[in-house]
Regions:
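Ribonuclease/tRNase effector modules and their secretory precursors
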Residues: 1-213
Length: 213
């Protein structure tokens, strides 16, 4: 599959390409494998694998995101989240799950936690906000729905803008060094060097909830 994508990338003009493929084992376990290929390093490829969990109806990523403490955390996408992402980020109804996953893998390279409480988290991305529910039993952050930037309230926008430029910068660096060279970038230390702390982000987004009461 990766070789096929490399051939497609060589024929086209795109900077990178991503495709998502279905895979099922003999015991009927369903997987979705997203393969990312970058023109700048065409001999290498990056992939994420999602396992479908029928009991909870979500796609659990076998790889990890970085939380604010720079430690690995597992996450999953619900079908509802993927539908809302397609509708609100891409303006498309009834997009296939594979196409939505491929777009997320291609366009969202880095995320930043900007709010959390005992039950939920809010993660900022280049496309908008992921609203997550914490599943303590499974140790997974479940992405329940997606909020595009144009839907944000004024206090939410303030929190988002604090990290928007950094997300863009880190997305470019992530694509360059982490996806291709497997070198981890440290967002937390960079934020601290710019005078931005986790408390700043949480307080900014938290104003939205204070004003809502």
């Amino acid at each position: 599959k990766a070789k096929k994508l490399i051939r497609e990338l060589r024929k086209g003009m795109g900077r990178n390409t991503t495709q998502c493929y279905d895979f099922k084992t003999k015991d009927a376990t369903e997987y979705k494998v997203c393969v990312f290929v970058d023109r700048g390093n065409i001999r290498k490829f990056y992939f994420d694998m999602f396992i479908y969990c029928k009991e909870t109806n979500d796609y659990v990523c076998a790889t990890s995101l970085l939380d604010e403490e720079n430690s690995a955390e597992q996450f999953s996408y619900t079908p509802h989240f993927l539908r809302r992402y397609a509708e609100r980020a891409l303006g498309v109804d009834n997009m296939s799950i594979n196409r939505v996953l491929a777009h997320i893998e291609r366009e969202i390279a880095y995320t930043v936690l900007i709010y959390k409480n005992d039950a939920s988290k809010v993660v900022a991305t280049s496309m908008g906000l992921f609203l997550q529910k914490i599943d303590y039993k499974r140790g997974i952050n479940i992405c329940k729905t997606f909020v595009s930037v144009d839907m944000l309230k004024s206090s939410q926008i303030k929190a988002y803008m604090v990290v928007a430029d950094l997300i863009k910068e880190y997305s470019e660096r992530y694509n360059k060094v982490q996806r291709n060279d497997n070198v981890r970038v440290d967002f937390t230390n960079d934020c601290l060097s710019r005078g931005i702390t986790e408390k700043d982000l949480v307080n900014a987004y938290g104003e939205y909830f204070k004003n809502k009461r």
